């Protein structure tokens, strides 16, 4: 494959469900310097719809796509059970890979993918799309600047209706990796203790209601409230610290700061009491579609030889933490010590 420095990159998409169609649209319309060259899905109707009005070729088999098309990048938006074989085929063909989260079904599969990318000299990154939300990026910048002072708690809320399309996993593995990843991304610390409760109310096989808690090494408490039972979507993240609280709305791309005007270095009782009386400030956010930002940064990293936008090891940790949450709920026990440390290594 020729150098990518000064030429149009050729992208492919594997998996043409709802999210796959979004990848098709963004690659085709929104990322400069990239052309959508090929798509693949076993559903012939889905392939026909995706290629209609576009120059991209359609395939019913990813292996044939890799054999017949010279690609630089591919989005793998297939079911989780297919991530490993499809990613291995792509990497062997010399194609840089973005795989939607979760990275894989197991640690072993994720490790195989990471090692295959290293051996092939190609990039593997993972679609943890919330990292590319402008509200979260602005929040991270402000936390790094110390605007909240000491951070006490991070509370993630991710609620919505039951998605009939999900069959292979429950709500924890499907959704919790988003927030587990963002917590580590924002506070720069690792969990040392976790506990979770789950219930199955509607889903026929897996849990659809989840509440979890994490204690991080730096003392921050993480709280997760996630379900498939709420008739409207809610996606928020609040971060509470000694100088107030930030609330980010993922959907609205909104970031609001509630100041604690009495906060000071000694953190007096008066300071605590005044939290409810703080002023509200809405931070200015330049709104962008997170998927467009994500794919543009993936393409730029490939073109420039940079590090992956999301380290696949971080994605593996998010997956394994989610699975440990399920284990905690099943056992009714706190998980800590070596049993949790093995997830991070």
Predicted regions: what is each one?
Residues 1-53:
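N-terminal Rossmann-like dinucleotide-binding module
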Residues 1-8, 73-75, 297-345:
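C-terminal helix-rich "cap/oligomerization" subdomain common to oxidoreductases
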Residues 22, 42, 282-296, 310:
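Active-site loop of classical SDR/Rossmann-like NAD(P)-dependent oxidoreductases
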Residues 23, 56-116:
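Beta-loop-alpha module in the N-terminal Rossmann-like domain of NAD(P)-dependent dehydrogenases
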Residues 60, 99, 124-126, 248:
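Hydrophobic residues in well-ordered beta-strands that form the structural core
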Residues 104-166:
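A contiguous active-site-proximal alpha/beta segment in oxidoreductase catalytic domains
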Residues 127-134, 160-193, 207-208, 314-315:
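Mid-domain beta-loop-alpha active-site segment that forms a flexible
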Residues 180-260, 288-305, 323, 343-345:
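Contiguous beta-strand/loop segments that form the cofactor/metal-binding neighborhood of enzyme cores
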């Amino acid at each position: 494959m020729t150098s990518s420095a000064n030429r149009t990159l050729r992208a492919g998409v594997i998996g043409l469900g709802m999210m796959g169609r979004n990848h098709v649209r963004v690659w085709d319309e929104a990322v400069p310097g990239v052309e959508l060259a090929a798509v693949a899905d076993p559903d012939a109707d889905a392939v026909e719809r995706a290629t209609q009005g576009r120059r991209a070729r359609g395939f019913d088999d990813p292996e044939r796509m890799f054999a017949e098309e010279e690609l630089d990048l591919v989005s793998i938006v297939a079911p989780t059970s297919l991530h490993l074989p499809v990613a291995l085929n792509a990497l062997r063909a010399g194609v840089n890979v973005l795989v939607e989260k979760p990275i894989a079904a197991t640690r072993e599969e994720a490790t195989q993918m990471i090692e295959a990318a290293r051996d092939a000299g190609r990039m593997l990154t993972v679609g943890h799309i919330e990292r590319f939300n402008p509200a979260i990026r602005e929040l991270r910048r402000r936390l790094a600047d110390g605007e909240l002072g000491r951070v006490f708690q991070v509370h993630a809320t991710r609620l919505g209706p039951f998605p009939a399309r999900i069959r292979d996993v429950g709500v924890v593995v499907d959704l919790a990796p988003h927030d587990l990843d963002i917590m580590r991304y924002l506070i720069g610390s690792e969990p040392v203790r976790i506990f979770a409760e789950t219930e199955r109310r509607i889903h026929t096989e897996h849990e659809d209601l989840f509440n979890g808690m994490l204690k991080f090494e730096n003392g921050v408490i993480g709280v997760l409230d996630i379900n498939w039972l709420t008739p409207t979507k809610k996606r928020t993240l609040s971060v509470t610290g000694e100088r107030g609280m930030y609330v980010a709305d993922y959907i609205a791309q909104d970031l609001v700061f509630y100041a604690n005007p009495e906060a000071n270095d000694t953190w007096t009782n008066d300071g605590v009491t005044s939290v409810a009386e703080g002023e509200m400030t809405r931070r200015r956010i330049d709104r962008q579609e997170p998927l467009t930002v994500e794919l543009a940064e993936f393409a730029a990293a490939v073109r420039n030889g940079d590090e992956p936008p999301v380290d696949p090891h971080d994605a593996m940790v998010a997956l394994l933490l989610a699975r440990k949450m399920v284990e905690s709920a099943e056992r009714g026990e706190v998980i800590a010590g070596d049993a949790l440390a093995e997830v991070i290594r």
